[in-house]
């Protein structure tokens, strides 16, 4: 199966379960992490033909997605004597995808890269759309570029080795897509047998459908708003809260998708308090998240600090926080005129 991301410039295809043989007449630099390399690198190498292949592994986890690790990656690229015709392959989850794309975008002012995601979260979100970057002390993904891959290959085979926690985290991003753009997808999600899904024993077709539905939705959004001027902001549903939670917990307590799950619950509570979402729809999202074992609560210790952290969000402008809300489910809304009092009141409900 193939889905084309039809951009005015730099259009590309996402191949789902179609990874066969990749041929290059240049050097190839594979960026991965130790776990994925141990599980799947031999499989990937058997499918690549190139002049030379270089392999670099970096520690995985949001806490390592920073400028220090980026410098390490770039040094390995220079030591490999890559040129502008070389190709970087990001082979891993969302962290590897973000860092690999960023490295490719700034190495010698840009080289080609290909995403081969190995987590569900990366398949449905991080690997498609061209957002790249790293975190710093001020927040998540505040340093980065928009830089599109030449191709993306999503293989359900790789997902079979994921933990139930990793699969659930990917499902959170899929739920986000449904809540913003297609209410009917929630019906599909509710029919999935959570036990076989979380054990990765479900039919490959389930993974294929999840990936395809997500990419079809996201590609349509990216095609209309590649640089996130407005419409693409809706893909950040739950993320305004999630990024603060991740930053406050040093990126160690929650997987990204888990933080997004909590963020969606918080965003829904805000929408509920503002009269933009009804209780039944808010509860429906909670029930679906719980079905897949995702967290739905976070204890805020200092409401004022949490509130101030919102202003480091990339969607904030002119001292206003742009919140992405579901109003109703299946239809996203960007609202930047919410009073501090209303925001604080919602945050206090999570103390």
Swiss-Prot record:
Source superkingdom: Bacteria
Role noted for this protein: Catalyzes the conversion of 3-deoxy-D-arabino-heptulosonate 7-phosphate (DAHP) to dehydroquinate (DHQ).
Enzyme Commission code: 4.2.3.4
GO molecular function, one term: nucleotide binding
Species of the source: Campylobacter jejuni subsp. jejuni serotype O:2 (strain ATCC 700819 / NCTC 11168)
Protein name: 3-dehydroquinate synthase
Cofactor info, note text: Binds 1 divalent metal cation per subunit. Can use either Co(2+) or Zn(2+).
Annotated catalysed reactions: 7-phospho-2-dehydro-3-deoxy-D-arabino-heptonate = 3-dehydroquinate + phosphate
The protein's annotated pathway: Metabolic intermediate biosynthesis; chorismate biosynthesis; chorismate from D-erythrose 4-phosphate and phosphoenolpyruvate: step 2/7
